[in-house]
């Protein structure tokens, strides 16, 4: 094997390992970490709508959301997956299990509401 071929194979192997490692790291996020990564900036750490974007979009409170209050899991799942208005959809970023964990977490936050 020529040195050039060996170098190209080594670069390809390293690139592949980096790519796989980046995907694996995301998959190991706990549910609160998923929420912090994808949701908290707008919805706040506890779902209270006090995130960084509150001034731009004041209706971000998950705790008083009609969908959450009536227990509509399908609607919450759809909003997370497809987005709505200024909220982006996360279908390409979350696998089905992560999506379901975020739906569960949304309702958990509402139950913990003071």
PLM region spans:
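Sec-dependent bacterial lipoprotein signal peptides
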Residues: 1-25
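C-terminal capping alpha-helices of c-type cytochrome domains
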Residues: 79-80, 91-114
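Inter-heme linker and motif-flanking segments adjacent to c-type heme-binding CXXCH motifs
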Residues: 25-27, 48, 108-114
């Amino acid at each position: 094997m020529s040195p050039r071929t060996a170098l190209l194979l080594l670069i390809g192997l390293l690139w592949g390992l980096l790519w796989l490692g980046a995907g694996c790291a995301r998959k190991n996020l706990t549910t609160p970490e998923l929420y912090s990564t994808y949701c908290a900036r707008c919805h706040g750490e506890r779902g209270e709508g006090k995130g960084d974007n509150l001034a731009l979009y004041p209706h971000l409170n998950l705790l008083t959301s009609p969908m959450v209050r009536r227990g509509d899991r399908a609607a919450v799942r759809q909003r997370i997956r497809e987005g709505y208005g200024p909220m982006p959809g996360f279908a390409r970023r979350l696998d089905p299990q992560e999506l379901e964990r975020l739906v569960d977490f949304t309702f958990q936050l509402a139950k913990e509401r003071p």
